[in-house]
Amino acid sequence: ALLLGAMKEVQPYLVITVPLVMEKIFKSKVAPIVNKPVMKVLCAIPGLNQVIFKKVRNTLLNAFGGKVREIVMGGAALNPDVEKWFRRFKLPFTVGYGMTEAAPLMAYEDWWEFASKSCGKAIDTVEVRIDSEDPYNKVGEIQARGMNIMSGYYKNEEATKAAFTEDGWMRTGDLGLLDEKGNIFIKGRS
């Protein structure tokens, strides 16, 4: 309640948050509406469902002050059911990927091109690879290199050596896959 009160006052254009915040807002503001039996029926009627989805989308955006152009989430995976509903509402959201050692962003995609269940594509200053024989089908460690990837840990050669492959790619410790378009799909931790 405190966060949404501040959002109404500040009226941000961009919201950067963790998925848990959006999931809690969904569960408190939207789920009670769309999970009613009558709403489930109405949401299944073509045409009428778009009117309902637009109203719900506006309710969500107004909860953030009414001026939000994009919601960027990161730090964890977004609940697939919540993502499904956000897509139905045409909510302008995306999920990015990064870590402190990457200052902090490594992957992102504009909300209108964002691939479901991904965390976007490597940003312009970063290359990402999957340490796998088949990075499109077999999970492997996500590795990165580029301008904003750290060069090492301050005064800690041992940790720096462990953080990089012999050919200079930073080990993220995250497991994932790529698709043909370069979208990254996180599957866990190594």
Feature roles, as predicted:
Residues 129, 136-190:
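Conserved ATP-binding/catalytic segment of the ANL
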